[in-house]
Amino acid sequence: MRIKTFVIAFFLIISIGKVAAETSSRNIISVNADYAERSEKTGYTIYRGNVEISQGNLLIKADQIQIFYAEGSAKSIVCEGLPSTLEYEASDQTLIKAEANNLSYSVDKNIVDLKNNATLQNNGTVIRGDSITYDLTLDTWQAKGGDKDEQNRIQLLIPAIGTPGL
């Protein structure tokens, strides 16, 4: 009986996370910038200067953002900045923050790739590395250090029990 209850609870939690992620990806994308240029033929759009993009519970800021469209909707967002930042409120109200010099977001897959000076903050834990991939739907991440030397390893800071954010 306990195993059955656990299995049901597990799948319910996964379903709720997926519904929240799908709801976010179905929201309208709002963009503010100093400059924009678009090709109606290809759907490619580039924004420059204090660019802010929001979609549901997701906010991205960068110096330059490119949006690639297919079949009438945005498929990927590529950001450059020193740094580019992302804030995402998860379904459990946890605020996830990310920053990197290069940030890309796959709208359909709900995955963020952070490259060059990448940092991810989630529920008090801080992850730093050369690159981090974060799946917003599954709430999973992978981090990689740089290839040059041992100085470029990943760093993981886990707060002590009782620290705010846990």
Spans of features found by a protein language model:
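Mature-chain termini and adjacent capping regions
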Residues: 1-166
